[in-house]
Amino acid sequence: MIVAKGLSKVYGEFRAVDGIDFEVHRGESFGILGPNGAGKSTTMKMIAAVSKRTDGELTILGKDPNLKGPEIRAHLGVVPQKDLLDRELKAWENLYIYGRYFGLSKKFLKPKVEEMLAFAQLEEKRNSKVEEMSGGMQRRLAIARGLINEPEILLLDEPTTGLDPQARHVLWDRLFRLKENGVTTVITTHYMDEAEQLCDRLVVMDKGKIMAEGTPAGLIKDYSSKEVLEVRFGTDRNEATAPQLATIAERIEVLPDRILVYVEDGDAALEKIHALGLRPVTSLVRRSSLEDVFLRLTGRSLVD
Amino acid sequence: MSDLKFVPGQAVNVRHAMRVGAFRVAEYRLRNMAKWWDAIIAFGIGNPVLYLVSVGIGIGALVDHSTGGHGIGGVSYLQFVAPALLASAAMQGMSDEVTFPVLEGFTWSKYFFAIGGTVISPKQIVNGIYLAAFVRGIWTVLTYGLILLAFQAIPMVSFFPLILSSLLAGCGWTAVMMAVSAHIKDDDGFFAIIGRFVIAPMFLFSGTFYPLSQMPIYLQWIGWISPLWHSTDVGRVLTIGQPTQPWLMVVHFAYFVAMFIGGFAFTYPVFARRLAE
Amino acid sequence: MITSIATSMAVRIAEKRAGKFGSGVYSGRAGQLVERNFLAFKSSNWLVVISGFVEPVFYLLAFGLGIGKLIGGVTDGSGHTVSYAQYIVPALLATSAMNGAIYDSTWNVFFKMHFGKIYQAMLATSLGSLDVALGEIGWALLRGLTYSIGFMLVVAPMGLIPSWWGLLAIPGATLIAFGFASVGMGMTSFMKNFHQMDWINFFMLPMFLFSGTFYPISVFPEWIQWIIRALPLNQAVELIRGLTLGNLNLAMAGHALYFVVMIAAGLFFTTKRLTALFMS
Ligand SMILES: Nc1ncnc2c1ncn2[C@@H]1O[C@H](COP(=O)(O)OP(=O)(O)O)[C@@H](O)[C@H]1O
Ligand SMILES: [Mg+2]
């Protein structure tokens, strides 16, 4: 449904998106994972057919956004990073008016607005203004708004950034439901748990470039070990202990506050550390995550 | 818990949507304006009544008294200022509906970017905003004109030509203000500056309260570039039979048209650029 | 380092004032707010600042010189005839004091309350709500004072201030601004949206047009005159006009008292409201 080849966006001298290739297929949930400033929003705006690409090729729903912007946008649902809701209007009016922009009739929109309010679990807030709603509710309203034209593709730019954990889970639940209904979605995020939860397939993006592509499980398999042992020796001693740890694992990462030891069996590795006569202050064994993939690819963590 | 059941991509009739875009933006603006209906009605009626009473029995009394009851050019002072007040109200009422919304849309709530994500093109946003302002303009000149009639400040026969020429001045001025607003990155006292350096002098020095020729020559240029003066001049020809020349009337209307075209010409590309950022 | 000094100072002040009357709302640090506004002001748009000064000058040019020619002289309160320009200069001074004070204490404050959320942050420190009210109003006065001095510097050389008493018009305008700013800020603290803010302008316009600014109120029937006399702008115009034209009379003490009451009432409600809004 979306094909990008060598897609670039240059602001002045700065290459915000630097020659990326990817494809999004019908019915899948596609993710773009990357830290702040990676170029996710810029990519999204090009896919949304509002921002013109500087270079490369981009086809959305079989059309070129430079030539057929309105036609493409007619079948997209957009949930921008900042919600961009109209603060003067009530919840239902925000949905209704947005539907009108797509040329939809009052007859069509009347039941549709109620359906979307129900989907976003905002029936009670139907007549509230945007200010009177929590951040999570506003985001759900923005998602409902993005779905009002029954789009082929829904674009979500950092849908849960700035929300508290509970609001995030409510939102994830809604997005799962969308997936079950066969809506194609593109999601950007800098949360690795979100990417693991919501995406069938994803690309890891950093500094305008794509570093890797695959399924969450596949990426972890390719770029990390099965388990990770996190040990802390105290801030001043981590660095000194590192060389010794390197002998028991194929790879380690020294972070300012802890050391990550990449191994197949975490508990066994911990025993080996004890056998070396080292006594970490704390230790923790966990499964590898996309965070580790990112660290491996860029040498930095996702959230700074 | 509810589920969504739809076949993606079926609901929108693209060609229809692209055709009606501007009207849908106007619909949005009018709905938004309707939330302020009480203020719009109060200003629409209160403003002219207050000015007419104040000028009519206040300043007018002083002027008419000191000119021996002849006012200016043989008409009462109220009749002299009436066309200027009407044109000024049309310009102000209409332009308010582009300046604030444009700043709101680009800078405050950034709602234009949401509209820009739909079928609607930047050009259609411009047209829609303007269309809604035009509706406000019609309302303003109609109410103001009727109140002028009630105060016997204008003759009945000149009612329609007068409100029409005022509306034209409003259209030209509003297009210019739309272009100015589109260029504003952050407001930073924008309205205070425009209000005090542009609108206030224009209101005061456009031959509004006394003939332009009475002003020192070094201030008269304000009148010549001011749409308010052009409109007032047309209005006085229509209402109090002020003598004129055909070429001057042509200049007046050409000026409105030029502002209208120029305003749009400087607005369209800015909207297109800013929405694509 | 600086923060630790500031903190220890705040604590000292809080301790000093603890138990004193009004300690919950006032810590004697309103100056901090004025200082903050001054810093913000230095980086703000200078055109906006100048614009507050040019407005009355424009009106003077248009009405005083333009319409003045049509009108000739006006009889002032004591029966003397003065030129039209001399007649409206004090009114313009009073009006610009009002406009400036209202602008600073309504729109400005409204923005800070609802968008900048500046007060929440301030009231979380040792500042009390009266500090905020006084500081904000003090700032409005400082600006107003600058404008009135500037205006006087323009009109006095033109011979439009016939009396030396006119010098007192500057503190007079400051008193007027204080009154409007206190009440304006009190009203603003009750406003919830722009819509309501718009109504402030709606009530300012008739006040401007009818308060004896451009013509004597004697043109109106007696009962309307009494309504006008009750309006603060008419009180202000009468006060300043008495000073610049040198017509001193006892009624002026009444006008001054009017503003003292306005100030007290305005401060009382603003403090109460800010406390209820942010500190409960
Ligand atoms: N309109 C713009 N003009 C100039 N630079 C921009 C613009 N938009 C984004 N950038 C820059 O491009 C980079 C990528 O931004 P963005 O796509 O928003 O990143 P992300 O969404 O991944 O956090 C950032 O460094 C940002 O500063
Ligand atoms: Mg982003």
Show which residues each predicted segment covers.
Chain C
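Hydrophobic transmembrane alpha-helices and immediately adjacent juxtamembrane helices
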Residues: 1-167, 171-280
